[in-house]
Design a protein with these regions (language model features):
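C-terminal cap/substrate-recognition subdomain and adjoining C-terminal extension
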Residues: 1-121
Length: 121
């Protein structure tokens, strides 16, 4: 979620992050999520998912001339498999999907975002 990725961005000096936006009402998470438009499928998409992090990753890498090997992707669901596979570093975070785990470079099973810190340094 953006509340976590923005914290990591600020702490480690990333240029930017893209993630689902967790909605809050009166400082309490509602459970609703906004999906960035860069995730949405279009005629250039390389996968069949309606929304996919790979769409955003390819778009951003192309726009800023970044090699895919210099990217890090965190995912937990089937719709993340194609992006985890293409990223320079793919992380399965608390996934119950064996395919996600099988394509990831790193697997984190404990729901603890602190486990990500050594991987982004």
């Amino acid at each position: 979620y953006d509340c976590v990725t923005n914290h990591l961005k600020n702490r480690f000096g990333f240029d930017f992050t893209i993630s689902n936006e967790l909605e809050f009402s009166r400082s309490v998470a509602t459970g609703e999520v906004k999906i960035p438009s860069l995730f949405l499928s279009d005629d250039q998409s390389q996968c069949k998912h309606d929304y996919c992090k790979l769409n955003a990753l390819i778009n951003i890498c192309s726009r800023y001339e970044v090699d895919l090997k210099n990217t890090l992707v965190i995912g937990d669901g089937e719709n993340d498999i194609c992006c985890i596979r293409k990223a320079g570093i793919g992380i399965s975070f608390c996934s119950t999907n064996v395919m996600v785990d099988s394509v990831a470079d790193y697997i984190i099973k404990k729901r603890d975002f602190q486990k990500l810190i050594p991987l982004v340094r």
